[in-house]
Amino acid sequence: MLELAVQKVVVHPLVLLSVVDHFNRIGKVGNQKRVVGVLLGSWQKKVLDVSNSFAVPFDEDDKDDSVWFLDHDYLENMYGMFKKVNARERIVGWYHTGPKLHKNDIAINELMKRYCPNSVLVIIDVKPKDLGLPTEAYISVEEVHDDGTPTSKTFEHVTSEIGAEEAEEVGVEHLLRDIKDTTVGTLSQRITNQVHGLKGLNSKLLDIRGYLEKVATGKLPINHQIIYQLQDVFNLLPDVSLQEFVKAFYLKTNDQMVVVYLASLIRSVVALHNLINNKIANRDAEKKEGQEKEDSKKDRKDDKEKEKEKSDVKKEEKKEKK
């Protein structure tokens, strides 16, 4: 198998934000289904570090995939200005918002090879439906057919990930802090993340099934590398029909259910204890309030008696004077 020029693509958050902004701006003025731009970055051995990007005017015919337009002059002028700011950032490939590969991507990639021999295509999904990375990286390779027909250009998938420098990480943390919903509890958030993860897994399994069905019906050629990788995945799956696996699963499930039951029981006892304490506190408060009222009445009665005694004394003094 031919060794690829790049084995991993690292996309920075700044690139993702720029692409989303590009898509939102174009979406307001036109009806384009996708936008196209240029990726800037640097190579570190077989790892491509994509640190910046800029948009490029692009248009295509919805009915005829062979009809498309990309502004070369704009691309060269923008790259010249970016090069003055940071000479280390070079053209390393291009992006579009997909969300899937298009038939004319090979032709566009051949054009981008004028500026970068090992041009990399990164598809950035600006509206992801499932949990996971919004990026898919590809590099063009020569595909050799088993039937002896001439080779053709095709895309080979490359591993991609999101990476950032320290300054970018701080900015992303601030953004996440602003949009994070503090009212959502930890448990519900964990369950939501698991549900999203299962939905993502389900979509991947559906893609695998669809691919295998198309290969079986002859709609797609057999790619032995993909078949071998799928076989490795299937070999890693546990045999759920084994008695030992079933027993271990039941034991673990029972242990978890016991923990849940004990937690619910403890929660009920604590709630009952709090209810009793609250009732006692209310009773003491009512008793104290009643005692204070009685003391207040008694004090007022004593004050009246003292005033009466004083008035009687004054009357007697007046009589004696007379």
UniProtKB/Swiss-Prot annotation:
The keyword Ubl conjugation applies. It holds the Pfam family MitMem_reg. There is a cross-link at K180 (Glycyl lysine isopeptide (Lys-Gly) (interchain with G-Cter in ubiquitin)). Gene3D superfamilies: Cytidine Deaminase, domain 2. The modification N6-acetyllysine is found at K204, K214, K314, K315. Residues 9-144 form the MPN domain. One of its GO terms (cellular component) is proteasome complex. The keyword Ubl conjugation applies. GO terms for biological process: proteasome-mediated ubiquitin-dependent protein catabolic process. Transmembrane segments: none annotated. CDD domains: MPN_RPN7_8. Keywords: Acetylation, Isopeptide bond, Proteasome, Ubl conjugation. Residues 281-322 are annotated as: Disordered. GO terms for molecular function: metallopeptidase activity; protein homodimerization activity. Component of the 26S proteasome, a multiprotein complex involved in the ATP-dependent degradation of ubiquitinated proteins. This complex plays a key role in the maintenance of protein homeostasis by removing misfolded or damaged proteins, which could impair cellular functions, and by removing proteins whose functions are no longer required. Therefore, the proteasome participates in numerous cellular processes, including cell cycle progression, apoptosis, or DNA damage repair. PANTHER family: 26S PROTEASOME NON-ATPASE REGULATORY SUBUNIT 7, EUKARYOTIC TRANSLATION INITIATION FACTOR 3 SUBUNIT F-RELATED. Does not bind a metal ion. Belongs to the peptidase M67A family. Component of the 19S proteasome regulatory particle complex. The 26S proteasome consists of a 20S core particle (CP) and two 19S regulatory subunits (RP). The regulatory particle is made of a lid composed of 9 subunits including PSMD7, a base containing 6 ATPases and few additional components. Within the complex, PSMD7 interacts with subunit PSMD4 through their respective MPN domain. Interacts with TRIM5. This is 26S proteasome non-ATPase regulatory subunit 7. The lineage of its organism: Eukaryota, Metazoa, Chordata, Craniata, Vertebrata.
